[in-house]
């Protein structure tokens, strides 16, 4: 219901973003990436494309803000997390929730410890504690000689800790608090 309303309300913005992407670079406006959802079920996540076509074949899954695979408008879309809006489609399809641990790519899920597998016990979401902490992951990775190593050593452990915190604490009130904090970060910085 909420995702349906969100899609209707943001449809003019969707159209504007699609036009910007199509004018900026060749290829589809939407990117569909492989992610792992609740109970380890794979699904395709929708995002507005912020990278060159076939960028995932040119490098790893971690993306620094200065990654040469990024399109010209990627910075704008990522700054306001507009590239994430199509995930409302995933929410509508029941593959994701508004709040929950961000869905991971299969290669990272394969690295989960037994304890970390608890992350897969709840639906993945568009935002969570970890999203608030690493709001601009690309900026953290900017200038890194090895973005993947930086991600694995500096970002991933904290994301996992915060995702497990969400699994332990999740409730309607926690979800509401995370949504409000996410909106605050989006609009107030």
Language-model segments: which ranges?
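A hydrophobic, helix-centered structural microdomain
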Residues: 1-53, 166-189
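Short, glycine-rich, amphipathic interfacial segments at transmembrane boundaries or analogous
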Residues: 31-69, 129-156
